[in-house]
């Protein structure tokens, strides 16, 4: 390429393109033309841009849709629930949320998750089925955010199964009690008839 003063120039950058003159030593004479494009690298500051969250297995980096700045994250990570089952939530639902709302929402969800796990730890077979159903659906929601819900969800499902088994056992027990009561009633009536028949025979003598 020639400059306006007539002197021959080396590589010249124009609008993101690297233009090399045919006579320049770096000219690519492979038949692809006198110009070749060189992709420019652009580096973005991840702290200033919202990145789409990606989950991963242990050892892989997780990109969050916000920057952690709240002190509460250290409290969450030191909690017994996190120590028992390490958590790596990535909050995909917050990918397109404004950063100023994303982190507080994620912190709220994390605190709620810890509370739910501790609540389930204290549940028993007497817990109402309606309450167990609510927690079952809640943990499914947490799972969509990247939380490991295998343990608490298993506890909820186990309690639901135990409640069903106990309800079935009670139903069978009531059925047996009713059957025994019916048999006893029939036997009692039969004894009454036998006694009456015996008395009639004695009277006839």
Curated annotation (Swiss-Prot):
May be involved in the polar growth of plant cells via transportation of RNAs. Disulfide bonds: none annotated. It comes from the Eukaryota. Residues 28-59 are annotated as: Disordered. It holds the Pfam family DUF724. It comes from Arabidopsis thaliana (Mouse-ear cress). The keyword Cell membrane does not apply. Disruption phenotype: No visible phenotype under normal growth conditions. The keyword ATP-binding does not apply. The gene is DUF4. Expressed in roots, leaves, stems, flowers and siliques. One of its GO terms (cellular component) is nucleus. It is found in: Nucleus. This is DUF724 domain-containing protein 4. Transmembrane segments: none annotated. Residues 63-189 form the DUF724 domain. Keywords: Growth regulation, Nucleus, Transport.
């Amino acid at each position: 390429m020639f400059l306006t003063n007539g002197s021959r120039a080396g590589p010249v950058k124009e609008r993101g393109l690297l233009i090399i003159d045919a006579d320049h030593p770096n000219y690519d004479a492979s038949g692809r033309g006198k110009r070749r494009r060189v992709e420019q690298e652009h580096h973005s500051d991840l702290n200033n841009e919202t990145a789409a969250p990606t989950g991963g297995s242990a050892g892989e980096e997780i990109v969050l849709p916000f920057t952690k700045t709240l002190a509460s994250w250290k409290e969450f990570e030191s909690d017994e629930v996190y120590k028992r089952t390490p958590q790596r939530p990535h909050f995909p639902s917050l990918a397109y949320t404004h950063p100023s709302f994303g982190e507080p929402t994620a912190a709220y969800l994390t605190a709620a998750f810890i509370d739910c796990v501790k609540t389930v730890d204290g549940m028993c077979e007497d817990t109402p089925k309606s309450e167990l159903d609510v927690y079952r659906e809640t943990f499914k929601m947490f799972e969509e955010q990247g939380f490991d819900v295998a343990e608490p969800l298993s506890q909820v499902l186990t309690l639901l199964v135990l409640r069903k088994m106990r309800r079935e056992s009670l139903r069978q027990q009531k059925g047996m009690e009713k059957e025994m009561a019916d048999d006893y009633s029939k036997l009692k009536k039969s004894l009454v008839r036998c006694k009456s028949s015996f008395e009639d025979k004695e009277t006839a003598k």
